[in-house]
Amino acid sequence: MFGRSFPFYNSLGGFYPQSLDARKPPGSGYTSKVRVRDRYHIVGFISSGTYGRVYKAIGKNGQKGEFAIKKFKPDKEGEIIQYTGLSQSAIREMALCSELDHPNVVQLAEIILEDKCIFMVFEYTEHDLLQIIHHHTQPQRHAIPALMVRSILFQLLNGLLYLHTNWVLHRDLKPANILVTSSGAIRIGDLGLARLFYKPLNSLFSGDKVVVTIWYRAPELLMGSRHYTPAVDLWAVGCIFAELLSLRPIFKGEEAKMDSKKTVPFQRNQMMKIIEIMGLPTKEIWPGIVSMPEYSQLQSLAMSRAPGHFNRSSNLEGWYQSCLKNNGYSANSSAGTPGADGFDLLSRLLEYDPTKRITAQEALEHPYFKNGGPISANCFEGFEGKYPHRRVTQDDNDIRSGSLPGTKRSGLPDDSLLGRATKRLKE
């Protein structure tokens, strides 16, 4: 799928194998002595976060198409901007996106340095999975079609296989970071937490003690594992698969925050949410669990509950069958339902033991994809509905402005802010 591999020296330092397919088009990468407004017309403001702001733009002067421009904010003290450098997350994202090139990974067009501000220019995507899930939670709307779920999952795993083959862990897969173009192509986005795992100088834990949004965090991370693998991304894919079917997070726990000493607490509530569906993990099904730093906390959690409160065996199949029934999927294996093959894939993605968890390569060869007929590269194919466009506002479209808005997400349409969906914006 990826062709012959060869070593290359990338911008993070060190030699890493890379596929011959991963070649950036001419013009991508770092650009200096260029002004953003000379190359792009700023349409409006999309969203902001701890990293800075994102704007929608249209190319001009030879730059064709729509783009999303990510502006990284400098550190501020009062009214004086302190140029102390970029965050580790921003540097990683720029370095990795400059090297990666795959149809299911977001495409970086260029990086512009202007007046000590960094701008990453990406292809524009009209939707993301969080937006699509919100759309289907509204009254009078139905579940996401089974064929659409299958196409989304296949494309997601295809992009993830590319990352893992090139020694990249994403480490923050969640619906909001899975982008969807207007033509139904899936793009894995937001590589700010991504890391190379080919002979790292330090353990992955030492650089970032907390990775992956809590609802999608693998059990080995919750158990304090210092050395983790691509399996953490596959657990997150399992959580996303379940959420596409049920329209709500399968393990919706509450995160315990770090204390003043920056000590990572045991995520007791999140682990309980997993146990309620997956059963209590034991050394018989996960031998390595006894050596995990938080194993004593897990034992304490189990003993604090009344006997029989936690199932010793998994209730995932019961959850799955209830999900199919409640969302109108057929109970029989057919093109209109995930069926038994869907459950088998889900159970292998949500395997407690990371050494037994299915890989991206194995998942792509699973009967769920093999037995259901051709898979479209357009996840919207056959879907008669219309998803609203990403909301773009004019309130803050001055890309050269020094002021920074508060953290918010403006990418969701108005109707997705109603009812149950409102809570999701606080994750």
From Swiss-Prot:
Q: What CDD domains does the entry give?
A: STKc_CDK8_like (cd07842)
Query: Does the keyword field hold Magnesium?
Result: yes
| A Pfam family of this chain | Pkinase
Where does it primarily localize?
nucleus
Please name the catalytic residues of this protein. Answer: D172 (proton acceptor)
Show the InterPro entries listed in the entry: CDK, Kinase-like_dom_sf, Prot_kinase_dom, Ser/Thr_kinase_AS
- Name the cofactor(s) required for activity, per the record: Mg(2+)
For bias kind Basic and acidic residues, which ranges apply?
Answer: 390-399
Positions contributing to ATP binding:
I46, S47, S48, G49, T50, Y51, G52, R53, V54, K70
Enzyme Commission (EC) number: 2.7.11.22, 2.7.11.23
Molecular function GO terms recorded: ATP binding; cyclin-dependent protein serine/threonine kinase activity; metal ion binding; protein serine kinase activity; RNA polymerase II CTD heptapeptide repeat kinase activity
> Which Gene Ontology cellular-component terms appear in the entry?
CKM complex; mediator complex
Q: Its family?
A: Belongs to the protein kinase superfamily. CMGC Ser/Thr protein kinase family. CDC2/CDKX subfamily.
Name assigned to this protein? Serine/threonine-protein kinase ssn3
What is the protein's species of origin?
Aspergillus niger (strain ATCC MYA-4892 / CBS 513.88 / FGSC A1513)
Question: What gene does the UniProt entry assign to this protein?
Answer: ssn3
